């Protein structure tokens, strides 16, 4: 194999696609069951009430309601508050 580059070759030209991570639904926003709230690598946010966690650590709503971000035992958690419990 050649160890020197040939004519018009380059060692550059590679780039990976963005992973589109981050918060998808913000505090106070209404979500339906199954809607993705946060896409993440690792548990930056932990699931709280009425929130499930996928195998890739994605957080999603288990029932309809409003998103609430908070803290529990020093961890950042995401909760979904059911519609009836949210004051007008």
From Swiss-Prot:
The family classification in the record reads:
Belongs to the bacterial ribosomal protein bL27 family.
GO cellular component annotations, sorted alphabetically? cytosolic large ribosomal subunit
Q: What keyword terms does UniProt attach to this protein?
A: Ribonucleoprotein, Ribosomal protein
Protein species of origin: Frankia casuarinae (strain DSM 45818 / CECT 9043 / HFP020203 / CcI3)
A Gene Ontology molecular function term for this protein is: structural constituent of ribosome
| Pfam families (alphabetical) | Ribosomal_L27
- Gene this chain is encoded by: rpmA
What are the GO BP annotations of this UniProt entry?
translation
Query: What are the boundaries of the region Disordered?
Result: 1-21
**InterPro entries documented for this protein:** Ribosomal_bL27, Ribosomal_bL27_CS
The UniProt entry, under HAMAP family, shows: Ribosomal_bL27
Where is the sequence biased in composition, kind Polar residues?
7-19
Q: What is this protein called?
A: Large ribosomal subunit protein bL27
